[in-house]
Structure formats: structure tokens, C-alpha cells
């Protein structure tokens, strides 16, 4: 096994031979015949297609996307959202009922449940305008994209981080991570910017102004590892236990 992902009530694993194994609740990704799609069309089962040739899996809310070595995307699970009928993808990401296929030419294709994501031509146009998108992440009701020029594009619920990014997110960003309520971005100068509901880092702005080398998150908090070995955590402003700095 080279990768394993949770599906709420099930799990999906990718093996080194390119096969996929699932177990758990049948409707949340375990049964690969449930809401199964191949080449943009509904199929009875993906069992044979998942025996080999898979190079990446991505999953959210009981939905699974599997990227094959031929560039096609297979999908199955709880929501049953139809992926594009093309075979020129090199990466795939699933987040909050929305799906993003990264194509070989650098463009991004989106699909998912209407009203809960970027499944529209206007948002897809924004993602494909300007610099190439390197990464997309999702909070509970918002999304953020990191672009090749170090800028960040965000959309969705403003209280969950979907508001327009501030000027300090227009360049220099090298990583973004989500939690359920917002996002945090690591900049090339070692500083951190966070935004969205419950992700206010003003209380520790001095600790996060430099020296951060890695960001992590759980469902409601963020953690920053600093170059001196210390850790700074923050999150929902009502959760005072998450406002700490731990020395090395």
C-alpha cells in the first residue's frame, strides 16, 4: 500500500501495483459499482478498471476519484458526480463536493455539485486565467487555489475563507492548508497569513511573522513548525486551548 484515504464511513487504498482496495460502508466509496463513472459515462462497475493502472486517488465526503496512467479519471461513491470525458489529466483533487482535474497543458477542469463549488464556467475561467494553478484545497464551504506566481485565489463562503485574498496573498505564497473554517498560507519569507472564520492569528502575529518552515491543520486549528523547533498553534477564537506556543 502506497496511499490510504478516509471516506467518512469507509477507506480506499492505492497499492504499488496500481490496484485499488476499498472497505467500509458500501455507499461511501466501498462499493465501486455505486454511482460509478468512466470516460464521462455511468457504468455498472469499476472493479476491473481498478485492478491496475491507477497512479493517484483523491477522496472527499464518500466520493473517490482515481487517476489512471492513461490520464483518465474514474469516479464512484456517495455523490455520483460525472467527471469529464477526456484522458489528458496529470493530477486530481477532491474537496467539499467539488473536483479538480489538472491537465497536461496546465489548465484546470472542474466539476461537482452545483451551488457547493466551482462547477461553473465562470470559476473555471478564473482558475485558468493568468498563472498556472499548482494546488487547490477546500474548507467546509470555501476553496483556495495556489498559483505558480505565488498568488492565492479564494472563493465560496466568506466566513469559511472564501473572501477575496488580501494584498499579502498576491505573491510569495509557497503553501496553503485548510481547516473546516478557513485557510493558512506559508510565504517564502517564513511568515504566515491565515483567514476565514476561527482562523485569526493576530494574537500570535509576532510568532508567525518569520521562521515558519511547515504548516499543518486539523478540523478547527492550525499548527506552524518553526526553524528553531518550536510549534505555534491557533484556531477558533473560542477555543483558547488552541492558542499556544510550544518550545523545542
Region spans (language model):
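Low-complexity/repetitive intrinsically disordered segments
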Residues: 1-5, 14, 232-234, 247-248
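A generic structural signal for ordered secondary structure
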Residues: 25, 57, 62, 67, ...
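Short, exposed beta-strand/loop patches in secreted or surface proteins that constitute
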Residues: 3, 12-13, 47-48, 55, ...
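Short glycine/serine- and acidic-residue-enriched loop/turn motifs that recur at repeat junctions
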Residues: 23-50, 76-86, 109-128, 155-169, ...
Amino acid at each position: 500500500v502506497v496511499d490510504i484515504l478516509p471516506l467518512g464511513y469507509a477507506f480506499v487504498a492505492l497499492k504499488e501495483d496500481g490496484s485499488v482496495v476499498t472497505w467500509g460502508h458500501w455507499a461511501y466509496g466501498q462499493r465501486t459499482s455505486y454511482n460509478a463513472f468512466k470516460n464521462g459515462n455511468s457504468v455498472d462497475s469499476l472493479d476491473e478498471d481498478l485492478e491496475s493502472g491507477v497512479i493517484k486517488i483523491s477522496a472527499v465526503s464518500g466520493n473517490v476519484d482515481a487517476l489512471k496512467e492513461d490520464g483518465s479519471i474514474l469516479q464512484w461513491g456517495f455523490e455520483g458526480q460525472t467527471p469529464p470525458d477526456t484522458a489528458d489529466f496529470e493530477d486530481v483533487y477532491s474537496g467539499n463536493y467539488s473536483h479538480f482535474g489538472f491537465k497536461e497543458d496546465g489548465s484546470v477542469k472542474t466539476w461537482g455539485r452545483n451551488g457547493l463549488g466551482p462547477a461553473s464556467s465562470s470559476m473555471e475561467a478564473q482558475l485558468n486565467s493568468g498563472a498556472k494553478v499548482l494546488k487547490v484545497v477546500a474548507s467546509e464551504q470555501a476553496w483556495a487555489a495556489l498559483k505558480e506566481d505565488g498568488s492565492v485565489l479564494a472563493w465560496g463562503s466568506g466566513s469559511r475563507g472564501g473572501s477575496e485574498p488580501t494584498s499579502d496573498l498576491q505573491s510569495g505564497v509557497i503553501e496553503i492548508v485548510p481547516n473546516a473554517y478557513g485557510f493558512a498560507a506559508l510565504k517564502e519569507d517564513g511568515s504566515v497569513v491565515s483567514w476565514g472564520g476561527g482562523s485569526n492569528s493576530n494574537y500570535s502575529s509576532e510568532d508567525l511573522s518569520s521562521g515558519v518552515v511547515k504548516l499543518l491543520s486539523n478540523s478547527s486549528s492550525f499548527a506552524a513548525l518553526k526553524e528553531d523547533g518550536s510549534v505555534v498553534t491557533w484556531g477558533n477564537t473560542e477555543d483558547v486551548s488552541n492558542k499556544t506556543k510550544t518550545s523545542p
